[in-house]
Regions:
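GST-like domain detector, emphasizing the conserved glutathione-binding G-site
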Residues: 4-115, 233, 243, 252, ...
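Mixed-charge, Lys/Arg-rich low-complexity intrinsically disordered regions
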Residues: 201-235
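Histidine- and/or cysteine-centered catalytic micro-motif in compact active-site loops
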Residues: 171, 209, 244
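GST-like fold's C-terminal all-alpha helical module
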Residues: 88-198
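Phosphate-binding active sites in nucleotide-utilizing proteins
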Residues: 247
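Short gly/pro-enriched beta-turn/loop segments at secondary-structure junctions
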Residues: 161-163, 233-236
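A short beta-strand micro-motif
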Residues: 238-244
């Protein structure tokens, strides 16, 4: 299980959505996953029929649209909670990785370092010397969390948990690999950690990759997308999407949806038939293919 997919598990449990889990390899290649995504190999990926959602940001948006209540963005923060979640899942997450893995780099095999170096630029020889800085940055960010909870609020937004809490929690859990336990940050953080942990991961059923692929083939994408004017692309154009990271993987398909929030590509594979692959606009490089 990827540490990042815990965010989505918590979202599903919070919304009381029954879901199916397909295990994917930690290290590339991931051939069955690529059948559905077209080459995107990061975790998590969510499938609803023949619609495939790549990246936590677009998955949470899809879950919020599918089951609006209880919201992942409770008042009074509302959508500002997404900005906190994006910070927690990107800037703070990398420092959490330093705090978690740097203290004991042998906890993961050499194949892991090779894979992460190729895909994310996370090379052992440059990562490990930066560990002291990342550890300091992790604790600095943890202090922000501690300060936010110091007024007695049960969750970041107040009385209800949401995406921001789940993304922040992943970092506190990640560093437990290095023996950094929640109580180190004080009672407010430890209690917050325990409240979120009690949410669990919902109604989960294990599924095979073949079952997921067959399910996509037996359904059709929902559709109804459009390409907004003034974005530099046209509906029906062949395009490629890749992340802003060093990861060379690209997904190529027919552009069917584009706005300031999302990118949607239509593509086909003999095993899954036609699927629509969804990406967030943030963090993705869109180019003509």
């Amino acid at each position: 299980m990827c540490i990042r997919d815990r965010i989505i598990r918590l979202c599903l449990a919070h919304k009381d959505i029954a879901w199916k889990s397909v295990e994917a390899p930690v290290i590339t290649p991931k051939p069955d996953l690529s059948v559905l995504t077209g080459g995107y190999e990061r975790i998590p990926v969510m499938q609803i029929g023949a619609d495939i959602y790549c990246d936590t940001d677009i998955i949470t948006a899809a879950l919020e649209a599918h089951t609006p209540e209880p919201s992942l963005y409770p008042a009074p923060l509302g959508s500002a909670g997404k900005m906190i979640a994006l910070w927690a899942a990107n800037s703070w997450f990398m420092n959490s990785a330093g705090a978690a893995l740097g203290a004991n780099p042998d906890i993961v095999p050499e194949e892991f370092w090779e894979d992460r170096g190729r895909r994310f630029g996370m090379k052992r020889e440059t990562f490990l010397p930066a560990v002291p800085h990342m550890q300091a940055q992790f604790h600095g960010a943890a202090q922000l969390l501690k300060d936010a909870l110091a007024d007695g609020r049960p969750y970041i937004a107040g009385d209800a948990p949401g995406h921001a809490d789940f993304a922040l929690l992943v970092n506190i859990r990640f560093v437990q690999f290095a023996g950094i336990l929640p109580n180190i940050f004080g009672d407010a953080v430890a209690d917050w950690h325990d409240r979120l942990g009690a949410i669990g991961e919902g109604d989960r059923e294990a599924w095979t990759a073949d079952a997921a692929i067959d399910h996509a083939r037996a359904t059709a994408p929902v559709g109804g997308h459009s390409v907004a004017d003034g974005k530099g692309f046209e509906a029906g154009q062949t395009v490629s999407v890749k992340t802003e990271s060093p990861d060379p993987a690209k997904v190529t398909g027919t552009l069917v949806g584009l706005d300031d929030r999302t990118i949607v590509l239509a593509r086909e594979h003999e095993r899954c038939g036609e699927v629509h692959v969804h990406f967030p606009r943030l963090g993705q490089i869109l180019t003509p293919a």
